[in-house]
């Protein structure tokens, strides 16, 4: 009986984790979306790579460029799906010099876009530490 209860709890936990995966949620939300090109995707946060992979899966024909800013080590499971993306790893939970560099790069990246560019921002937890741009 105890083993069955343990198995049930583990199965429920795995189901809950799968239900909130960033790639799945973003792919589902974006599946009916259409953006006029050129579309530029910016994903920031600890789930940035997962979210970018999800939107890439359903909007790949519309996406011109993707910039991902995430916590160091949080992009590796998604690296294969995001070969074309620019990935920046920065400081979390405390901002670092990398966070300042990420902020500078984000501003430059946006300035480099076409006049008629559309931007899709995907933001998850950790973004306020990962990207800093002092005024």
Per-region residue spans from a language model:
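Non-transmembrane, aqueous-exposed alpha-helical and coiled segments at domain scale
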Residues: 1-135
């Amino acid at each position: 009986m105890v083993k069955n209860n343990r198995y049930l709890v583990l199965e429920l936990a795995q189901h809950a984790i799968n239900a909130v995966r960033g790639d799945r949620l973003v792919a589902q939300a974006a599946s009916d979306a259409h953006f006029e090109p050129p579309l530029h995707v910016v994903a920031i946060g600890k789930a940035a790579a997962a979210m970018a992979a999800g939107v890439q899966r359903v909007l790949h024909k519309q996406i011109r460029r993707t910039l991902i800013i995430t916590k160091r080590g949080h992009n590796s499971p998604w690296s294969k799906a995001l070969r074309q993306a620019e990935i920046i790893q920065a400081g979390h939970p405390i901002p670092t010099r990398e966070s300042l560099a990420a902020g500078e790069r984000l501003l430059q990246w946006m300035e480099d876009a076409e006049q008629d560019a559309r931007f899709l921002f995907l933001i998850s937890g950790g973004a306020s530490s990962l990207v800093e741009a002092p005024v």
